[in-house]
Amino acid sequence: MDIAHDLQVIAAQEHALVFPQFDPDRAWQVGAYLHEVAKARGIPAAIDVRTFGQPLFFSLLDGATPDNVDWARRKGNTVAHFRRSSYAIGLKMQQAGSTLADKHGLPNTEYASHGGAFPLTVAGAGVIGSITVSGLPQRADHELVVEALCAHLGHDYSKLALAKA
């Protein structure tokens, strides 16, 4: 895995995957889509769609655990703090040989620099929340969210996907 290349692709994902507008109905649509995809693939995931401070969609699939719920919360907190995907932040920490606690003073009990939370961005408003999946390895969590956003925003997922690890 080439971290620098992945960071470039993630930056392109974050730039492209922007909603023209967003409301609770759209949150439900995206969340329900993620739920159905995860269910069809047998993924035991927690799915969380929220604006900062307001949950809009939450779902647990069969086999998901309280740890998945906590990971989703901490990944979402990372997006809220940095306004970037949790995977991008984790890769930057890996590249720097550091951690969120060491570099930014952010406790591991509240923040996670693992993939799976993606910024919920609205044109003209910026990052207003996060869309999070927890249940797979971090790269796969991240890509599942990207796949769902591509489906909802009319982008070709194959053009925005990370290279196979």
UniProtKB/Swiss-Prot annotation:
InterPro entries: PduO/GlcC-like, PduO/GlcC-like_sf, YBR137W-like. It comes from the Bacteria. It holds the Pfam family HbpS-like. Signal peptide: none annotated. NCBIfam families: PRK02487.1-4, PRK02487.1-5. Belongs to the UPF0303 family. This is UPF0303 protein Bxeno_A1932. It comes from Paraburkholderia xenovorans (strain LB400).
